[in-house]
């Protein structure tokens, strides 16, 4: 397909037909298990505080907002879905568009399809089993292997990620020819993520999916800290064929602790000369009201379809990638 034919779809129609069938499979998977399908807003007055996520921002001008109401396109439906959980929805799932003002390329598009679901009274391990069931059904792959973050990082990078200081992480980055990228980072977690992405991820999940669990507590985000080891969080990620597919948590339900994490993120943002982000007070109010103990996971549907079709890049399975949108 020539670049001059930019009106045409990025993906072959045959792939879009197969994609539609896979999305139908996903819906049946959850409806057969009794989960409620929901739709939540694509925009919000609040957004994520995570220093590694960049949301799109717009402004609503209308009744009651003549001066302009800042709105953010959602990077995931998580906050609204948790409000539904607190309101008594029970187990629920959603297939929706999410938006991140970041990369575009082989595995990224600023607008993408997210599958997210939440299971009240599931722990992290039980939810990992359900993710594994879904991957086996859609990808016709073997059951996943499970590895702790500490185990897989130590094996491939050569140092313990839970005890290494910034200097040791920088030295490891130099050893792996990542010194230039590491030299501009002053945040320990960013160095950990650099080493994990560049050294660990390429070496796991080749023949079958790999679940990595118990990420460092400093990367807990919205996850509970493990009761087994306070150095780690009850968080997991799923990888296959060198691609990150899913990110799941045993969800934090303590509103006070969640506020502290949001505020800590914003302090980091200020230190990095990034803009502070508005905290989602509605989410915190829902947590304070009482969200059931649960686990939840977000999965990239475009990447899942790409793997199912053995496609080379996301644009092979998206009707119109960003360069043709």
Curated annotation (Swiss-Prot):
Give the HAMAP family listed for this entry. EF_P_modif_A (MF_00174)
What function does this protein fulfil? With EpmB is involved in the beta-lysylation step of the post-translational modification of translation elongation factor P (EF-P). Catalyzes the ATP-dependent activation of (R)-beta-lysine produced by EpmB, forming a lysyl-adenylate, from which the beta-lysyl moiety is then transferred to the epsilon-amino group of a conserved specific lysine residue in EF-P.
- Name of protein: Elongation factor P--(R)-beta-lysine ligase
**PANTHER family of this UniProt entry?**
ELONGATION FACTOR P--(R)-BETA-LYSINE LIGASE, LYSYL-TRNA SYNTHETASE
Q: Which residues form a coiled coil?
A: none
List ligand-binding residues for substrate.
76-78, 118, 251
> What chemistry does it catalyse, as a reaction equation?
D-beta-lysine + L-lysyl-[protein] + ATP = N(6)-((3R)-3,6-diaminohexanoyl)-L-lysyl-[protein] + AMP + diphosphate + H(+)
């Amino acid at each position: 397909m020539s670049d001059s034919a930019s009106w045409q779809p990025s993906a072959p129609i045959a792939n879009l037909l197969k994609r539609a069938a896979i999305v139908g499979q996903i819906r049946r998977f959850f409806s057969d298990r009794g989960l409620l399908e929901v739709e939540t807003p694509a925009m919000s007055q609040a957004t994520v505080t995570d220093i590694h996520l960049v949301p799109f921002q717009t402004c609503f001008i209308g009744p009651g907002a003549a001066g302009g109401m800042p709105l953010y396109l959602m990077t995931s439906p998580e906050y609204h879905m948790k409000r539904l959980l607190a309101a008594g929805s029970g187990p629920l799932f959603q297939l929706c568009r999410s938006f991140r003002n970041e990369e575009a390329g082989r595995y990224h598009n600023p607008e993408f399809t997210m599958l997210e679901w939440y299971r009240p009274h599931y722990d992290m391990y039980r939810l990992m089993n359900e993710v594994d069931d879904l991957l086996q059904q859609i990808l016709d792959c073997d059951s996943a292997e499970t590895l702790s973050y500490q185990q897989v990082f130590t094996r491939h990078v050569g140092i313990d990620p839970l005890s290494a200081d910034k200097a040791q992480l920088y030295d490891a980055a130099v050893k792996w020819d990542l010194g230039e990228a590491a030299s501009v980072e002053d945040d320990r977690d960013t160095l950990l993520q650099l080493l994990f992405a560049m050294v660990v991820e390429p070496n796991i999940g080749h023949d079958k999916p790999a679940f990595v669990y118990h990420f460092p507590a400093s990367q807990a985000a919205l996850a509970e800290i493990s009761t087994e080891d306070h150095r780690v969080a009850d968080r997991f990620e799923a990888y296959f064929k060198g691609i990150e597919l899913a990110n799941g948590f045993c969800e934090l339900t303590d509103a006070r602790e969640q506020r502290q994490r949001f505020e800590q993120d914003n302090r980091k943002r200020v230190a990095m000369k990034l803009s502070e982000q508005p905290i989602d007070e509605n989410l915190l109010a829902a947590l304070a009201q009482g969200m059931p103990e649960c686990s939840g996971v977000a999965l990239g549907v475009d990447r899942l379809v790409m793997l199912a079709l053995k496609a080379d890049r996301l644009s092979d399975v998206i009707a119109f990638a960003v360069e043709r949108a």
